[in-house]
Swiss-Prot record:
InterPro entries on file: Beta_tubulin, Tub_FtsZ_C, Tubulin, Tubulin/FtsZ-like_C, Tubulin/FtsZ_2-layer-sand-dom, Tubulin/FtsZ_GTPase_sf, Tubulin_C, Tubulin_CS
Residues that, per the record, bind Mg(2+): 69
Cofactor needs: Mg(2+)
Keywords: Cytoplasm, Cytoskeleton, GTP-binding, Magnesium, Metal-binding, Microtubule, Nucleotide-binding
Primary gene name: TUBB1
PANTHER family, sorted: TUBULIN (PTHR11588)
Quaternary data: Dimer of alpha and beta chains. A typical microtubule is a hollow water-filled tube with an outer diameter of 25 nm and an inner diameter of 15 nM. Alpha-beta heterodimers associate head-to-tail to form protofilaments running lengthwise along the microtubule wall with the beta-tubulin subunit facing the microtubule plus end conferring a structural polarity. Microtubules usually have 13 protofilaments but different protofilament numbers can be found in some organisms and specialized cells.
Protein name as annotated: Tubulin beta-1 chain
GO terms, biological process: microtubule-based process
Length: 450
């Protein structure tokens, strides 16, 4: 069995993580005390992907919870599933990172990191075949971004051949939490480009939009947003946890989605999204799921896939459905919208089918796309970063923790390179020569004629 070790860091990561465990517990029939109360052998068959069976038949999540202040941890402990986690796996400091990446990465976080790594090692040794790590964090704050990326790079050193999947909440364009978000996010992306294998890009604004527009919630709470994220997270790994006709795992996902190693930032979507009141009036069909899943409004990050092209994509369907129909629908999407897919990667959409639907639904699907339009997110953060960095605004908070301005410059140029790479492959065509110079030459001639 292939285990996944779940790590959540910072306030955002811990809140998303707590919601995620509620969803996974419900799917596997685990009650808040860790006892199995389900009704199907399938729930237990591969339960050890996310759970460790302790003495007395209790199931304990393979989760490591870290934060630099005790607040969020305390509320998880007193929450509905607080008693299910192993008490030693709560690792927290007292001081907080104060939304400062440098505190999370170099000073406060660095002091706590060894005790986190001890817990990670202990959990990893409990696995007979560790497939990889999934990390939940945000990039705008101090702990999730600074300490989260520190942990990712340390795990990278120690387990170089395991998959590293992150669910990263990017700062949103309109919903801003702190003024130094662009700094924290840019410094984090700099790390994620190098050390993560797969990054699922989420952002609050897109999630708010889904809540307003599709779920018809008048004032959505973070709980609602986290519920959306956790549905997607559970969808990404359902193939590992339940039998299916076409299975995939984290590594297969990476091989199918990443054409170039640096371009591993994915947009995710989930279907069916229906408002709470209208669920009983909807019938679900594969065409309907497919249509909603590919809908640009369904993406959980504020980048519009219609502004770019898909390099690759993967769809994970859950429920009893005909594989033939799934394949037909996916082909249908590609044929109708062929201009939104790069033509130099043939068959670039992969689908997997898992037989067990999420709790309370007949069928569902999770979408993961590697689209060049994700550069919109990076470009936006980069512009905000440059605006502040040019004036060296707020920089003393970071240099005071021992950081060098050089690091900022490096992170900035790395992010701009990433944007340029996405743009390059968006513009590339199948028939141009190796260096892609033809296009440019033709344009120049065109201009002279005028």
């Amino acid at each position: 069995m292939r285990q996944i070790l779940h790590i959540q860091g910072g306030q955002c990561g811990n809140q998303i993580g707590a919601k995620f465990w509620e969803v996974v517990c419900a799917e596997h029939g685990i009650d808040p005390t860790g006892r199995y109360t389900g009704d199907s052998d399938l729930q237990l068959e591969r339960i050890d992907v996310y759970y460790n069976e302790a003495s007395g038949g209790r199931f304990v999540p393979r989760a490591v919870l870290m934060d630099l202040e005790p607040g969020t941890m305390d509320s998880i402990r007193s929450g509905p599933y607080g008693q299910i986690f192993r008490p030693d796996n709560f690792v927290f400091g007292q001081s907080g990172a104060g939304n400062n990446w440098a505190k999370g990465h170099y000073t406060e976080g660095a002091e706590l990191i060894d005790s986190v790594l001890d817990v990670v090692r202990k959990e990893a040794e409990n696995c007979d075949c560790l497939q990889g790590f999934q990390v939940c964090h945000s990039l705008g704050g101090g702990t999730g971004s600074g300490m989260g990326t520190l942990l990712i790079s340390k795990i990278r050193e120690e387990y170089p051949d395991r998959m590293m999947l992150t669910f990263s909440v990017f700062p949103s364009p309109k919903v801003s939490d702190t003024v130094v978000e662009p700094y924290n996010a840019t410094l984090s992306v700099h790390q994620l480009v190098e050390n993560a294998d797969e990054v699922m890009v989420l952002d609050n604004e897109a999630l708010y939009d889904i809540c307003f527009r599709i779920l018809k919630l008048s004032n959505p709470s973070f709980g609602d947003l986290n519920h959306l994220i956790s549905a997607t997270m559970s969808g990404v790994t359902c193939c590992l946890r339940f039998p299916g006709q076409l299975n995939s795992d984290l590594r297969k996902l990476a091989v199918n989605l990443i054409p170039f190693p640096r371009l591993h930032f994915f947009m995710v979507g989930f279907a069916p999204l229906t408002s709470r009141g209208s669920q009983q009036y909807r019938t679900l069909s594969v065409p309907e799921l497919t249509q909603q899943m590919w809908d640009a409004k369904n993406m959980m990050c504020a980048a519009d896939p219609r502004h770019g092209r898909y390099l690759t994509a993967s769809a994970m369907f859950r429920g009893k459905m005909s594989t033939k129909e799934v394949d037909e629908q996916m082909m249908n999407v590609q044929n109708k919208n062929s201009s939104y897919f790069v033509e130099w990667i043939p068959n670039n959409v992969k689908s997997t089918v898992c037989d067990i639907p999420p709790t309370g639904l007949k069928m569902a699907s999770t979408f993961i796309g590697n689209s060049t339009s994700i550069q919109e997110m990076f470009r936006r953060v980069s512009e905000q970063f440059t605006a502040m960095f040019r004036r060296k605004a707020f920089l003393h908070w970071y240099t005071g923790e021992g950081m060098d301005e050089m690091e900022f410059t490096e992170a900035e140029s790395n992010m701009n390179d990433l944007v340029a790479e996405y743009q390059q492959y968006q513009d590339a065509t199948a028939d141009e020569d190796e260096y892609g110079e033809e296009e440019g030459d033709e344009e120049e001639y065109g201009q002279h004629d005028i």
